[in-house]
Amino acid sequence: MARVTVEDCIDKVENRFELVLLASHRARLISQGASITIDRDNDKNPVVALREIADETLSPDDLKEDLIHSLQKHVEVDEPEPDPASMIAAGGVAAADSEEQDDLPETITFDQMSEEELLAGIEGLVPPEKSDDY
């Protein structure tokens, strides 16, 4: 890596550590087959990545977002929260429906379990057979 290339990049990304992270991420993308935005000139991938950052053919902010996204194992999706007024109205309707369904047999729900039911289930478990594996 030429010092001139790194010095050119410091104007675009002020923190040298962040520059190394972004350039290494871009170099990995290039080695995985991403298209380069400048002439290679027989340079290796890290130098090409630094030259892309220095020539501003890639936005450091976009690279940073891509790096963060690549490191995330679970991406949270922002879902709109339900309106409290509609939840209250839905609760009132559900209460009226439950009075009508008192004659029907009770269905088993897996979401709710009392402590006694949990303890009874645990006591009913059969311990695994001992083996010489451990």
Swiss-Prot record:
Domain of life: Bacteria
Record's catalysed reaction(s): RNA(n) + a ribonucleoside 5'-triphosphate = RNA(n+1) + diphosphate
Transmembrane region(s): none
The keyword Nucleotidyltransferase belongs to this UniProt entry's keyword annotation: yes
GO cellular component, one term: DNA-directed RNA polymerase complex
InterPro entries: DNA-dir_RNA_pol_omega, Pol_omega/Rpo6/RPB6, RPB6/omega-like_sf
Alphabetized UniProt keyword annotations: DNA-directed RNA polymerase, Nucleotidyltransferase, Transcription, Transferase
Enzyme class, UniProt record, top EC level: transferase
Molecular functions (GO terms): DNA binding; DNA-directed RNA polymerase activity
Record GO biological process: DNA-templated transcription
Chain segments annotated as coiled-coil in the UniProt record: none
EC number: 2.7.7.6
The protein's assembly and partners: The RNAP catalytic core consists of 2 alpha, 1 beta, 1 beta' and 1 omega subunit. When a sigma factor is associated with the core the holoenzyme is formed, which can initiate transcription.
Function (record text): Promotes RNA polymerase assembly. Latches the N- and C-terminal regions of the beta' subunit thereby facilitating its interaction with the beta and alpha subunits.
Similarity field: Belongs to the RNA polymerase subunit omega family.
Protein name, UniProt field: DNA-directed RNA polymerase subunit omega
Taxonomic placement: Bacteria, Pseudomonadati, Pseudomonadota, Alphaproteobacteria, Hyphomicrobiales
